[in-house]
């Protein structure tokens, strides 16, 4: 298999000129829980392994267990081959196969849309769910939605609409399709057709060093680059309490001055939306953005009539210990996008949520006015059924004792959010991590660590060296479900 793969396959995100040896090809036989069963290429005793795999390789085995360190590119939240997800996929495949979705409905898609809009991250602001296939596509849809709203709201002439730009943050990444790339700066992920459309602020970032939390402020905002060094993590994420601080004023002045220069005079930029990855820039380097700065950006965008898009493909659905960052930021978007852990990592699926105002911007008497975006497998039953099963497991997980205990270690009581009762224990205004505060404190004091940071299931750290290197670890959620899995 390795030789045949090297001769035939074109991998994503791989420089093939650097892969010349068959030993560099990872042959995965199967996967279970958080591990792969991998062909080791030789008959020799495999090292001891404490994994959930039912068959542990012994002497002379060709297989060995390998930890899925990337969580299969950030999608695995419940472990490989989770029985509930596998059965959900089989059930939908046997009942539906694939059926068309335009002007039709089926139970898995309807249930998914209703729970995300009415009882999920869209509660309180969203009215519609547009189901697609992956995060990049979901962001393309979000951009089309928001820019249509802006075009109508500002009366932008049709010939000028192709010039509309977006506001965002440097280091953002929204996918590999052309429109999603154009919503970002020029970078390693862009291509020959890329045309950056917009303006991107340098984001203030949060880190922990020697047990102390600091906010690294860009020089364009303030000369003192660590204005709030030493503040507790709970204070940094208490956005409402920080809105009247000197730093908030500095952020507002910087944002408003920049926008005034950008949108006035000759060569002014027509802006159409604010596009944010809330709290953490994932592919851009696991940058934990100061939430106060993002809130100031949101407020400034709202004041100028710009629709707000939250790209929650990476951060949404409890990755950061909360259902959605909206509860922490104290602000809702007009459009938001969910993918990756939406299906527990089993199959691809994305959902773009939109407010009623956004939906109404596409109403009319001709088809040309509709949102003409879709693909053959839009809202395919297998994906929707698996997503519902994954969400069922998440709802159970966040009410479990292990989840509450992890929160309690960080001083969060586990009952938060604005609506207690049906949403109790799902949203929280407190910040916490599955890694203990003591572990983070020790990690941040190591000589080899430049800084560390954690939130929810994400732990990121920078290593000292010639160039800054970043490591990221994603804690699997399946251990929180272990008792339920046995029942």
Regions found by a protein language model. Give the residues of each.
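Conserved N-terminal phosphate-binding loop of PLP-dependent enzymes in the Aspartate aminotransferase
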Residues: 1-487
């Amino acid at each position: 298999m390795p030789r045949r793969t090297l001769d035939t396959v074109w991998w994503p995100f791989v420089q093939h000129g650097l892969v010349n040896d068959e030993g560099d090809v990872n042959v995965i036989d199967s996967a279970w829980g958080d591990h792969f069963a991998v062909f080791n290429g030789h008959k020799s005793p495999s090292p001891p392994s404490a994994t959930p795999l039912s068959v542990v390789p012994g002497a002379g085995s060709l297989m060995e267990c390998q930890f899925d360190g990337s969580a299969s590119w950030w999608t695995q939240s419940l472990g490989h081959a989770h029985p509930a997800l596998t059965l959900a996929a089989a059930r939908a495949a046997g009942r539906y196969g694939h059926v068309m979705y335009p002007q039709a409905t089926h139970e898995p898609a309807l249930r998914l849309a209703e729970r995300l809009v009415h009882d999920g991250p869209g509660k309180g602001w969203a009215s519609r769910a547009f189901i697609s296939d992956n995060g990049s596509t979901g962001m393309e849809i979000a951009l089309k939605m928001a820019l249509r709203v802006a075009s109508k709201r500002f009366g932008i002439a049709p010939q000028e609409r192709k010039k509309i730009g977006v506001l965002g943050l440097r280091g953002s990444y929204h996918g590999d399709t052309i429109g999603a790339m154009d919503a970002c700066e020029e970078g390693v992920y862009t291509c020959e057709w890329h045309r950056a459309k917009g303006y991107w602020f340098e984001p203030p970032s949060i880190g922990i060093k020697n047990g102390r939390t600091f906010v690294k402020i860009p020089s364009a905002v303030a000369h003192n680059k660590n204005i709030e060094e030493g503040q507790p993590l709970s204070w940094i994420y208490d956005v409402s309490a920080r809105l009247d601080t000197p730093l908030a004023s500095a952020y507002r002045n910087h944002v408003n001055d920049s926008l005034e220069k950008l949108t006035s005079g000759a060569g002014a930029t027509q802006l159409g939306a604010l596009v944010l990855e809330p709290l953490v820039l994932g592919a851009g380097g696991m940058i934990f953005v100061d939430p106060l700065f993002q809130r100031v950006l949101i407020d400034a965008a709202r004041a100028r009539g710009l629709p707000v898009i939250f790209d929650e493909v990476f951060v949404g659905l409890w990755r950061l210990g909360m259902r959605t960052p909206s509860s922490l930021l104290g602000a809702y978007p007009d459009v938001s996008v969910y993918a990756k852990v939406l299906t527990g990592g089993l199959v691809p699926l994305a959902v773009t949520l939109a407010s009623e105002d956004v939906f109404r911007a596409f109403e009319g008497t001709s088809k040309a006015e509709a949102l003409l975006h879709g693909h053959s497998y839009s809202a395919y039953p297998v994906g929707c059924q698996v997503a519902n099963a994954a969400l069922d497991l998440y709802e159970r997980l966040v009410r479990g004792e292990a989840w509450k205990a992890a929160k309690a270690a960080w001083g969060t009581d586990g009952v938060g959010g604005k609506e207690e009762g049906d949403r109790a224990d799902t949203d929280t205004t407190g910040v916490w991590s599955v890694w203990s505060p003591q572990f983070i404190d020790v990690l941040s004091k190591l000589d080899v660590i430049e800084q560390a940071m954690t939130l929810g299931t994400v732990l990121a750290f920078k290593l000292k060296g010639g160039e800054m290197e970043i490591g990221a670890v994603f804690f699997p959620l399946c251990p929180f479900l272990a008792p339920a899995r046995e029942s």
